[in-house]
Amino acid sequence: MHYKLLFAAAAASLASAVSAAGVVGAAEGFAHGVTGGGSASPVYPTTTDELVSYLGDNEPRVIILDRTFDFTGTEGTETTTGCAPWGTASQCQVAINLHSWCDNYQASAPKVSVTDKAGILPITVNSNKSIVGQGTKGVIKGKGLRVVSGAKNVIIQNIAVTDINPKYVWGGDAITVDDSDLVWIDHVTTARIGRQHIVLGTSADNRVTISYSLIDGRSDYSATCNGHHYWGVYLDGSNDMVTLKGNYFYNLSGRMPKVQGNTLLHAVNNLFHNFDGHAFEIGTGGYVLAEGNVFQDVNIVVETPISGQLFSSPDANTNQQCASVFGRSCQLNAFGNSGSMSGSDTSIISKFAGKTIAAAHPPGNIAQWTMKNAGQGK
């Protein structure tokens, strides 16, 4: 009953975000303490140029989005020759030859003409920013966001990022974090994205929380040519601690998430639903503790072989070892019409010592609650 009350409180607090001019709640897990723009007076951009200016200046900002900012075509178009490594069927993504990717890695793939648009380079977000959507009105279309080059203390809450060259791999990412610290992505919806929905780059990205967000993999185009987006969440930083809590990952086929570099990931109380392919991909330097998650209709929960380390909260007895650091046992994961998740590397638990750890709840009501409450406007 206690966890039901906690989730009810979270839902109520975000419902108030529909009318609130500012951030609601506080980050759980590793990004705890992030303040974004703090108490700065809210600003309301009305044009794409004004939005870019507010996001990129050096002032602490609380930026309220109350409309759709459509960047599609705002930087012109460029027709180039790309490639079709997954085939030329109508549902297959084709690839832009970015940084000679087609030439270097897919030289034998059929050549195709593709159109390069504004989505290739995301909007720069500088330090001390809160980007907050009003109800379901705050949408950034055709271009993503990037928190990079030392930017820190950023909150992205209750917005949607959509329609970034969905036909084209390398067409753009929804949210990029690289060489940063204290970033909270909360109640965000991403949909119809060309490449990664969320990517943490190879520099140190430090403390990041992604919570109560919807990664919607439905698309007319995919690398697997079946309407299930492949490029979900890629965590590749050199010194990263990432909390994934309460998110809804829907209709994907891979990289959900891909974890490597030197990344400590706490994946807790997420719903993985309707995957035609794999969810977790754990490479060298990926340290994953997964608890209280629900996997429903996920063909492959963890791609093998695992090159990193995984503690999958495998059974009640083993899960008691979490108490030495977490002050509680870890929660079992739940599986419905899905593959298995096997990983009992308890050495990962000690890596959480002294860190801010998100609470975990039993998986019983996670699916129902997450479908109702994760994403923009919920």
Curated annotation (Swiss-Prot):
Keywords: Carbohydrate metabolism, Cell wall biogenesis/degradation, Disulfide bond, Glycoprotein, Lyase, Polysaccharide degradation, Secreted, Signal. InterPro entries: Pec_lyase (IPR002022), Pectin_lyas_fold (IPR012334), Pectin_lyase_fold/virulence (IPR011050), PEL (IPR045032). It holds the Pfam family Pectate_lyase_4. It is found in: Secreted. Coiled coil: none annotated. GO terms for molecular function: pectate lyase activity; pectin lyase activity. Transmembrane segments: none annotated. Glycans are attached at residues 128, 251. GO terms for biological process: cell wall organization; polysaccharide catabolic process. Disulfide bonds join 83-102, 92-225, 322-330. One of its GO terms (cellular component) is extracellular region. It is an enzyme of class 4 (lyase). Residues 1-20 form the signal peptide. It comes from the Eukaryota. Pectinolytic enzymes consist of four classes of enzymes: pectin lyase, polygalacturonase, pectin methylesterase and rhamnogalacturonase. Among pectinolytic enzymes, pectin lyase is the most important in depolymerization of pectin, since it cleaves internal glycosidic bonds of highly methylated pectins. This is Pectin lyase B. It comes from Aspergillus niger. The lineage of its organism: Eukaryota, Fungi, Dikarya, Ascomycota, Pezizomycotina. The gene is pelB.
